[in-house]
A protein has these predicted regions:
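Extracytoplasmic gate region of multi-pass secondary transporters
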Residues: 164-202, 320
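Intracellular juxtamembrane helix-capping segments at the cytosolic ends
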Residues: 66-80, 282-297
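C-terminal ends and interior cores of transmembrane alpha-helices
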Residues: 35-49, 237-262
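Symmetry-related core transmembrane helices of the 12-TM Major Facilitator Superfamily/SLC fold
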Residues: 116-135, 362-382
Length: 396
């Protein structure tokens, strides 16, 4: 729940920081962002008590919330309607290169050097980014279009919130990100409790950015002439199947032989499910950002693209809280169970006992997210039907 709240705030605050970035200029905003991230991560590296840790996390949330609308706004300003989707696909590929390499470096660092080194690594990376921004970041700025006062800033925020078509798509795509967010909410606990501590869920999660890096530019090029909602529809069709794959390990008996290697069913089906998620992201994210960028008037790129991230705010708040309840019901923490059941769970993981009744239906967790995906798909189909009918009526 705590992780969901902090993760959610990173996607809510960009609406406000995006408005501030439009006012102050993207260069100043990005300098402030990486300064906040450097100080925030450095604070986490120096302290261990609750209040300073919360202050450090708050600085990280605020810094990250500036980065999102500024970078996507820069992509929007630096591209035209012909190449905007491709520009966003390159941006998204680079983001996932960072995600993949970050996870790859941090996991062994945490194990071999201690978890306390991770904030210092993040602070150093943020400081390097700050130096690069100071040296080379020169975004296209149009001072005449920037909000001149708080009234114009608030008008831009209201313009974004009152765009009901945009708001509808934001709320519908939140269902997609609620499922994708289970990489960090349900999946780690599910893997450790159903396969054992020797399995590393962080490596499973790394499959997602790897797939995106490999395929996002090619897929975006393939769908470049599609309407954004059609590409998003493909993603919405795919995302329930990722949850189907993750649930399917419950129906596979024993290890699966893959090219002579004995692979645990959970490992196999998690990798398949996460790969499906990655491919679905390739259809959704660049075209969604392209759609969002076409809603913003000149000088208001930050606030509109900041508003576009609110779908993930709703997704993480819902997804992490929902995950907490589902894990407690179907895949509980062993230490919360009676001693006899906890012992049986340990023996079951070692292949020396039958599965405890408390874990017999753990895969039902993924059934719930299949439902979330199907509901979102139906809503998107209704959204496309309604908006196209509305457009036809206006043109007729």
């Amino acid at each position: 729940v705590v992780a969901g709240l902090f993760g959610g705030w990173i996607y809510l605050v960009p609406f406000f920081t995006g408005a501030a970035a439009d006012r102050m200029g993207f260069r100043k905003a990005l300098i402030l962002a990486f300064a906040l991230l450097t100080v925030g991560y450095g604070t986490l590296g120096m302290v261990t008590t609750l209040t300073p840790v919360l202050i450090g996390l708050g600085l990280i949330v605020l810094g990250g919330a500036f980065v999102k609308p500024v970078i996507t706004g820069t992509v929007s300003k630096s591209s035209d309607s012909f190449n905007r989707a491709r520009a966003f696909s390159i941006f998204y590929m680079v983001v996932n290169i960072g995600s993949f390499t970050g996870k790859t470096i941090v996991a062994p660092m945490r194990i071999q050097m201690g978890v306390e080194t991770v904030p210092w690594f993040s602070a150093g990376s943020s400081l390097l980014a700050l130096i690069l921004v100071l040296l080379i970041y020169r975004p296209p700025e149009d001072g005449a279009e920037q909000p001149r006062n708080m009234r114009e800033t608030l008008q831009g925020m209201w313009m974004a919130m009152s765009n009901l078509r945009f708001l509808g798509l934001i709320l519908i795509t939140a269902g997609f990100w609620a499922i994708q967010g289970q990489l960090y909410a349900s999946m780690p606990d599910y893997v450790l409790r159903m396969a054992g501590e020797t399995y590393k869920p962080e490596w499973y999660a790394n499959v997602n950015p790897l797939v995106v890096v490999l395929f996002v530019v090619a897929i975006t090029q393939m769908v470049r002439k599609w309407k954004p909602e059609n590409s998003i529809l493909v993603a919405m069709v795919m995302i329930p199947f990722s949850a189907v794959a993750m649930a399917s390990s419950a129906f596979i008996e024993g290890p699966v032989n893959i090219f002579g290697l004995a692979v645990h069913p959970i490992t196999l089906m998690m990798v398949i499910g996460i790969s499906i998620q990655g491919l679905a992201e390739c259809f959704l994210s660049p075209k969604y950002l392209e759609y969002a960028s076409k809603q913003d008037p000149p000088g208001k790129e930050g606030v509109f693209l900041g508003f576009a991230h609110i779908n993930t705010f709703f997704a993480w708040i819902f997804g992490f809280i929902f995950s907490g309840f589902l894990l407690k019901k179907y895949c509980p923490e062993p230490t919360t169970l009676p001693d006899a059941i906890a012992v049986q769970h340990t023996q079951w993981l070692a292949g020396q006992a039958p599965i405890p009744e408390a874990y017999a239906h753990a895969h039902y967790l993924w059934f719930a997210y299949i439902g979330v995906g199907l509901i979102s798909l139906v809503l998107l189909i209704g959204y496309i039907w309604f908006t196209r009918r509305l457009d036809a009526r206006r043109m007729g």
